[in-house]
Every structure is written in C-alpha cells, then in structure tokens.
Amino acid sequence: MIVNGTEKSALLLMAIGSDQAGEILKHLTPFEVQELITAMVNIKRVSAQKLNEILLQCYNLAIKNNAFNCNNSDKYLIKMLTKALGEKKGTSLLKEALEIRNARICIKALNYMKAKQVAFLLDKEHPQIITTILICLNKNQSAEVLSFLSDKKRAEIILRIVDFHGIEESSLVELTQVINNLLKNKKLILSEKGGIKTAAQILNSMKIKHEKEIIENISKSNEQLADKIIKEIFLFENLVDLDDKYIKILLENIEKEKLHIALQNTSQAIREKFFKNMSHTESNELTLNLEKKSYISDISIKNEQKLILIMLKSIVENGRISLKNLREYYV
C-alpha cells in the first residue's frame, strides 16, 4: 500500500519512464534520491483504483489513460539512475538499495521457518544479534523463538529489547550476512533430529556423574520424561556395537550367574557378543544354561542388565570397574 509522499513520488517516477525520471532526479539531493530508490525497490503491485488516486494528485502531469506499467525492474532503475547520476554513482546507489531490500526479504523468511529451528540457528550468536533479528520478525514468531532459548538468555534478550533504539538499514545487510554464514559455514541440519533417542545417545557418551546430574535435574521438573530417557539409555541391545575389549574386561569381573540372568530373553546377536569373548568351554556351558527353561522375573533380568551396562560404562571411562560408579547406578 502506498502510504506516504516518498512512495507516491517513487510510483510517479516509475510511471513516466527512465528518461524523464532521470532528468527529475538530477534536481534532487543525494539523500532524496536514495529515499526514492529505496521506496521503488520495495513497491509491490498497486490496484488501478489506487493508482488513479495517486496520479490524479499530480495535477501538473498529463494523464492519458488508466493503464500503468509499474516498472521497477533492475534494468529500468539502473537506466534511470545512470542518466541522473552517472554510471558509477547510479550503480552504487541501486546496489545499496537492492541489498537493503534483499536483507529485509532474508530476515522476513525466518518468519516462515519453524521457531525451534530459528532458535537452534541463533542460539550461539551474540545476544545483541539475536535481539535485533527477533525485533525484525513477527511478534508471534519472536515469542515462540524466545521460548526455545534458555531462561538466562531470554531474560537478557528482553532487557536488550527494552533498551533497543532502532537499527540502521546498513545493519540489515550485516544481519543477512550473519544468517547466510550460519547456514553456510556451520552446515546446520535444520531438521527434526531431536527426541528421546538422541538425548539418550548423547547422555550415553557422558561420564556417569554428569549423566546422573542431568537426569536428576530433568526429573525435578518432568519425572515421566526422565524415566523415558533412562529406559532409552539402558538398552541392552546397544552392547552389540561395543568394542570387544570392554566385554572381555567385564567377563573377568562379573559372576557367571548374573550374566546368565542378564542374557535371558535376549537376541542371538547379544548372546554371540559375549560367547565370542569367552572360552569355548564357558560359552558352551552358558549356552546350555540359557536353553533350559527358567522362571526368572523380568525385574531381575532388567536389574542385572542395568548393572552390566553400568559396569561397562565404568570400564569405558576408567579402563576398569569402579565401585564408586557402581554405587551411583540408577535404581
């Protein structure tokens, strides 16, 4: 929508042709020219009714008909500016105006991304950059993006928004470069790759002490979620991917009865993981015991499997069984 005199003037210049427009621009100040060019590159479609209203206000021009070609193509604008300011200055001015327009488009595009993805993209940036981008977005999108950031960061950004006093157009171009560099250099995969399984995999790679602290903190606010993560962490089936050297250390330190209980109702792949790291005699004996019908409860099986997982985690961390780590294992 055309709302001010600058936009009306820009529309008129696009209507009269590049030659006449260029002559008019020669009589304007550099600041006025820049204002008009910025308005031109941002003008969208105009209805015939609105166009007539604007052109009728230009009483000193002869209006021949209602037809109008809103010509704000780069080719038209550069031709007009070259006539008015010369090739070098005209090209430079148009380039600056187009950069600002493209910057607005780039930042506006973040409104159509999932808020969670935008938050992930911006999370490691300086709070002032995050603040500036959020101010440029739709308020609902900004609020949702903010909800995915940490409590501390949210508070800091709100304080910065309160103290925000505007942004120069040239800074919009810099913001666009920041966004493009994030996408290009970090090669972020903005897809749904989170979830309990991913969280469990990350926790599995941490030391037991830190893993336990995180689980306890999650449990304080969401006990049900903490339980789901714990169940995913303690998947006995994951042992098939573990290095055999750790399995061998485990077998040297675990009671045969506990191993027998833990291997109840497991897949052949899991059993083979242990069999191949045992002597032929031991593996045959364990195989025969597992083939016998047993009445071991599921709880007992899960507890022994959990103990083995903690022992293995301790071995991976320390190269040996740690009694301290065993005392810390989840009950």
From Swiss-Prot:
Keywords: Bacterial flagellum, Cell inner membrane, Cell membrane, Chemotaxis, Flagellar rotation, Membrane. SUPFAM superfamilies: FliG. GO terms for molecular function: cytoskeletal motor activity. GO terms for cellular component: bacterial-type flagellum basal body; plasma membrane. The record marks R160 as: Part of the EHPQR-motif. GO terms for biological process: bacterial-type flagellum-dependent cell motility; chemotaxis. Pfam families: FliG_C (PF01706), FliG_M (PF14841), FliG_N (PF14842). It is found in: Cell inner membrane; Bacterial flagellum basal body. It is a peripheral membrane protein. It comes from the Bacteria. A motif (Part of the EHPQR-motif) lies at residues 125-128. Belongs to the FliG family. FliG is one of three proteins (FliG, FliN, FliM) that forms the rotor-mounted switch complex (C ring), located at the base of the basal body. This complex interacts with the CheY and CheZ chemotaxis proteins, in addition to contacting components of the motor that determine the direction of flagellar rotation. This is Flagellar motor switch protein FliG. It comes from Buchnera aphidicola subsp. Acyrthosiphon pisum (strain APS).
